[in-house]
Each structure stands twice: as C-alpha cells, then as structure tokens.
Amino acid sequence: MLQDVMKKSKKIVIKIGSNTLSNVDGTINHDFIEALCQQVAFLVGEGKQVVIVTSGARIAGISRTNKWSRKEDMNYKQALCAIGQVELMSAYNSHFSHHGIYIGQLLLTREDFFDKTRNLNIRNTLFTLVDEGIVPIINENDTVSVEQIKIGDNDTLAAYTATLWNADLLILLSDIDGIYNKNPKEYEDAELLEQVQNIDDMLKEIEVGETNSFGTGGIETKIEAARIVNRYNIPMILGNGKNKEILMKLYQNEAKATIFFRE
C-alpha cells in the first residue's frame, strides 16, 4: 500500500523533525540533508511536487554559536532560531543546488492559516512556487511566535500545510519506524502498526510516550497531525528519517512505516 500511495500522489508534503535533522551532538546532519535532497530531486523528476516542512532552527542556532543552549528565556530561544534559520536554509540551498533545484522560504504562524487573506496569500505563493519547479521550505516563524499565535510543533504545521495546499500525501520523518503498540526504545517485543484506519481505536491499543529529545513534538502530535489530514482524506505516512534512503524505500515498498488513512 505504501508504494501505491507514493506513486499515485502528485502533491507531497514532507516534514523533517529536529531529531531526524540533527546528529547526536545536536549539530546539523548534512549527510541526511544531502540524501533527502537527492531523493526529493528524484520525486520531482517523477513529476511530483514537493513541499518541505522543516524543524531545526534552534538546534542550528546552538550549533552555530555554541552558547545560550541552556538559557530558557524566550528572547534567547527566539534569537537562536533567528540565527539558526539562516544556517538551516543555507544548508538546504547548498545541497539542493547539487541537484539543480531552487528553494523558497516561508515562515508562518497560526494566524497565517486562520486569517482568510493570509491563508489565500500562502496558497497562491505555494501554488506559484511549485508550478515553477521550486521546492518551498516552511518553518514556524519562531522569532515572532508568542503563545497566542504560535502553532507549537511542526507536525501540526505540516498538517495545516497539507490541508491548505490540498496535498495528496503527508510524510512525517521522525526517529522511529512508525507507531508501535508500545515504546520500541524500551520494549523489545513492541509491534509496528503498519496501517491505521481508526485513530480512536488505535489509541485504545497503544501506550503514548513522551516528547522527543531536540524537538517539540512527540508521538501525540504526530497522531493529531494524522487526525487533521485524514479529515480531508489525505493519507499520512510516519517513517524513520534516520534511514537516509527512506523516501526511496517507501517508493519501492521496502520500508517499515505506519500509514494513516480513511477508506
């Protein structure tokens, strides 16, 4: 089923989590970004349009400055994101250029999705970029996001983007193969749920874990993202971004993953 969905989908949103994007020491994983860009270039060559939702601005800021990492003051966090966003986009631009692909940046807040004028402007920008062969790269605008207007996690941001753009598929790349009935990092007998059609029924059967190391979204936010896009009949795949060839393996039906969908 994964292969069928991948091949039938023309408009694909791919979300990259902080844990996927970072090395163990918190620095940007350039090998991963290069592998990602190569696979996106393949998908574009197959006639698909791709939008990337990326996390990682804060860890990129910490990596670049090597300070402030333990300061919890909001101003410091936002300053790190301002520094790191430049580093992050520079990395994407450099690696995509190896494949002849240009990128465009969109930094968004919750208000952008729920204000009619802003919503329309984002839609028009996205459609124009992809129609011209550009890969849009989206992140939350952390430097202006306060509690009242922030989305809070990029799983939700990716889900909002997929519905706004009328995507055919949302792919979340995390540091696990998909949804398990219990935490695979703690239990060797954890079983992967390959297909989920009813999220409420699934929640009765699994144990939901904690937030991850570098990011703001744990399993709960990924499940909620699936719920959001499934309402619009958009399937969602949760796969392991630590597998550098994950997109190709999904395309070739060789990867472990969980797909959420509605009949």
From Swiss-Prot:
Q: What class of enzyme is it?
A: transferase
Keywords attached to this Swiss-Prot or TrEMBL record, sorted alphabetically, are: Amino-acid biosynthesis, ATP-binding, Cytoplasm, Kinase, Nucleotide-binding, Proline biosynthesis, Transferase
Q: Name one GO molecular function term.
A: ATP binding
Disulfide cysteine pairs (residue numbers)? none
| Catalytic activity entry | L-glutamate + ATP = L-glutamyl 5-phosphate + ADP
Pathways involved: Amino-acid biosynthesis; L-proline biosynthesis; L-glutamate 5-semialdehyde from L-glutamate: step 1/2
Q: Which InterPro entries match?
A: AceGlu_kinase-like_sf, Asp/Glu/Uridylate_kinase, G5K_ProB, Glu/AcGlu_kinase, Glu_5kinase, Glu_5kinase/COase_Synthase, Glutamate_5-kinase_CS
Task: List the residue ranges forming a coiled coil, or say none.
Answer: none
List locations, semicolon-separated: Cytoplasm
Q: Which domain of life is it from?
A: Bacteria
Q: What does this protein do?
A: Catalyzes the transfer of a phosphate group to glutamate to form L-glutamate 5-phosphate.
In the record, the note on similarity to other proteins reads: Belongs to the glutamate 5-kinase family.
**Name of protein:** Glutamate 5-kinase
Organism (species) = Alkaliphilus oremlandii (strain OhILAs) (Clostridium oremlandii (strain OhILAs))
Gene name tied to this protein: proB
